[in-house]
Amino acid sequence: MPRRRIIGTRKILPDPKFSSELLAKFINILMIDGKKSIAEVIVYTALKNLSKRTDKKELEAFEIALENVRPTVEVKSRRVGGSTYQVPVEVRPVRRNALAMRWIVESARKRVDKSMSLRLSNELYDALENKGTAVKKREEVHRMAEANKAFAHYRW
């Protein structure tokens, strides 16, 4: 066993506009090459567009969209004997958020719209409506876990 001390998780500073740690994490995931101010402008513009379309507050709409994309179970590879099984495991809360944010950003980048803020707002709107690529990804992960339910006893 290593004798080094256990390093705690870094505390993330809340975003300047809404004072939300969740939104700050989302901005960090969207950020490319350390250009945080550009990422902030993209996210805030997308949230403004989203709030106009849904008549909900920006942060409230974002949290609902994120909730619709969060996975509850996923599959992990586990080697038993000579074969590898896809074992369904429950996803920890921090990882749920991270996966949901990553999937939303990835699917927004794949979209074909004029600007990134428009793509992001459309993807968040689709997530609010329980449709779109990010929600499809979550459904796919859940389907995989359901299909491999028989191997759940290999959990560690």
UniProtKB/Swiss-Prot annotation:
Keywords: Ribonucleoprotein, Ribosomal protein, RNA-binding, rRNA-binding, tRNA-binding. GO terms for cellular component: small ribosomal subunit. GO terms for biological process: translation. The keyword Transmembrane does not apply. SUPFAM superfamilies: Ribosomal protein S7. InterPro entries: Ribosomal_uS7, Ribosomal_uS7_bac/org-type, Ribosomal_uS7_CS, Ribosomal_uS7_dom, Ribosomal_uS7_dom_sf. The keyword Ribonucleoprotein applies. GO terms for molecular function: rRNA binding; structural constituent of ribosome; tRNA binding. One of the primary rRNA binding proteins, it binds directly to 16S rRNA where it nucleates assembly of the head domain of the 30S subunit. Is located at the subunit interface close to the decoding center, probably blocks exit of the E-site tRNA. Belongs to the universal ribosomal protein uS7 family. Part of the 30S ribosomal subunit. Contacts proteins S9 and S11. This is Small ribosomal subunit protein uS7. The lineage of its organism: Bacteria, Pseudomonadati, Pseudomonadota, Gammaproteobacteria, Enterobacterales. The gene is rpsG.
